Regions:
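Conserved catalytic cores and adjacent C-terminal regulatory segments
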Residues: 1-337
């Protein structure tokens, strides 16, 4: 039986990356149970990976190799990355808070914190070293166009190969939060300036499917299966009368939620039509309750605990779907022992 190409896609969302990381922890557990293999990892059961912004961090964690060419981090350890380092990544000095007016007139955070975390976790690992084909969206400011970091291209061409820590700095350069990222290829021959690809592909699932088709033009959706993970969404139902008097400040705050939700939901809508099969396409996301506001940079303990609980709720409520999908992943793999 011909096996399907298995695709994993993870949305952007800052510290909310905890949510899909928790879901992946459960998926990894099911894969170990199904295969009776205590070393089973996510990387063994997917063929193409895509992550935007914080999703790129998770993908990098899942695919970075140790010295035995096995994944360096488990999904559980990626959750710990966020919980233990969130305050380092999103750490604004009093001076920076005043200078930026909380991000209104300057970037909200000094990038030294996030850069130190990437240095600690990924060191000199290069894009070409990742264990599986990878697609990570960014926006190139200097040329005014979308750009994708591709592991397959990096393996065949040095002009597409970057240090993972630099790539992630670019992929997470969310506007108003961090300054644009100016990076060079490993061979120092190409120099570019990027911002977070969430401006056009916060849900990179459709881009991942397009990447699959680019490399396999003779194959279609029926030849693939995809797991698409969100980072939690905020209700954006607004009263028309109230919003009729809003100005830039109100729309700036709400507009971020609306844009992020809209980008993610339109990709989901299109992929449901493309796949036309619930068994081959699974989208998992959660809705923030009314007592919690969706925030990319809130690192207070109670909020981090809530993000973990939201991920657990998704995993529990969709347990049957996740277990069924895990079974199909194993069936379409040659690593079943």
């Amino acid at each position: 039986m011909k096996t399907k190409t298995r695709i994993l896609s993870i949305d952007g969302g800052g510290i909310k990356g905890i949510v899909p990381a928790v879901v992946l922890k459960h998926l990894e557990k099911y894969l170990r149970q199904l295969t009776n293999n205590p070393d089973a990892r996510i990387v063994d059961y997917f063929d193409l990976f895509s992550g935007a912004s914080t999703g790129a961090i998770i993908i990098a964690g899942l695919l970075s190799p140790n010295n035995q060419d096995r994944p360096k981090y488990t999904a559980e350890e990626i959750i710990e990355l966020y919980i233990e380092n969130g305050h380092v990544i999103f750490n604004a000095s009093v001076f920076q808070e005043i200078k930026s007016v909380s991000g209104l007139v300057n970037v909200k955070y000094d990038p030294k914190g996030i850069e130190s975390v990437f240095e600690e976790y990924f060191g000199n690992t290069q894009l070409k070293d990742l264990l599986k084909p990878t697609l990570i969206p960014v926006y190139e400011l200097s040329r005014g166009k979308n750009y994708f970091f591709r592991q397959q291209k990096a393996r065949t061409s040095s002009r597409h190969n970057y240090y993972l820590k630099d790539l992630l700095r670019s992929a997470t350069s969310a506007i108003t939060y961090f300054p644009p990222s100016q990076i060079s290829t490993v061979n120092n021959k190409a120099h570019r300036c990027f911002i977070d690809g969430g401006v056009f592909a916060n849900n990179p699932a459709l881009s991942a499917y397009a990447e699959f088709r680019y490399h396999n033009p003779e194959l279609y959706a029926k030849d693939t299966m995809m797991l698409s993970l969100g980072t939690g969404r905020q209700s954006t139902h607004l009263d028309c009368e109230i919003t009729s008097s809003w100005g830039a400040a109100e729309w700036l705050y709400q507009g971020g939620f609306m844009t992020s939700n809209a980008i993610s939901s339109v990709s989901d809508y299109q992929l449901k039509a493309v796949y036309d099969s619930a068994s081959n396409y699974l989208r998992l996301d959660g809705l923030f309750d009314e007592s919690h506001s969706s925030s990319m940079d809130n690192t207070k303990k109670d909020y981090l605990d809530y993000l973990v609980s939201l991920g657990e709720s998704i995993a529990n409520e969709r347990q049957s779907d996740i277990e069924t999908f895990a079974q199909k992943l194993v069936e379409n793999s040659d690593k079943t022992s």
